[in-house]
Design a protein with these regions (language model features):
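Non-heme di-metal
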Residues: 1-180
Length: 180
């Protein structure tokens, strides 16, 4: 992704802090909304969610200023690198510290989440490979493709350009998988 005009400045640090703060607030408010709903406060839950949506948009403003959104391949690489940091460095360090401080159950939870982050990295790298090799909607063997809009099934090496049932574009197709 491109470097920003504010690179290396306090303004860049402020943009990163604003993005992090707005992102954290969004998540926190969605958790608060869930709790309010469980306690029977529908209006309060709705207002927490409305505010969470506002915070999401605020975060997006600052993330865009930081040139944080690239094309899909750049975004997949960025996501994979972020997940790699989380499982190889961040959670590993957190687990060691928790163990040293006697929080062994929390250390184990950090390790379990690190394993999930490793899976996330692998998934993003596989998707990046598919994008780079133009293999998102075309495979070397016959697959069952499903339209995510209407559920139409197509069998072949590639997804159709347009769904014959609902006219949605190829981008709505994915490889059909039963997981139940």
């Amino acid at each position: 992704m491109k470097e920003t005009k504010s690179a290396g400045t306090q303004t860049e640090k402020n943009l990163m802090a604003a993005f992090a703060g707005e992102s954290a607030a969004r998540n926190k408010y969605t958790y608060f909304a869930s709790k309010a709903k469980k306690e029977g406060y529908e209006q309060i839950a709705a207002l927490f969610l409305k505010t969470a949506d506002n915070e999401k948009e605020h975060a997006k403003l600052w993330f865009k200023e930081l040139n944080g959104i690239g094309d899909t391949a750049e975004n997949l690489l960025s996501a994979a690198e972020g997940e790699n940091y989380e499982w190889t460095d961040m959670y590993d360090g957190f687990a060691k510290t928790a163990d040293e401080e006697g929080f062994h159950e929390l250390a184990q939870r950090f390790r379990l989440v690190a394993a999930i982050e490793k899976h996330h990295e692998e998934r993003y790298r596989a998707l990046l490979h598919n994008v780079e090799m133009a293999e998102v909607f075309a495979k070397s063997e016959v697959k069952v493709w499903e339209c995510r809009n209407c559920g139409h099934i197509v069998i072949g090496e590639k997804a159709p350009e347009v769904c014959p049932a609902c006219n949605h574009p190829q981008s709505y197709f994915e490889i059909h998988a039963e997981n139940y």
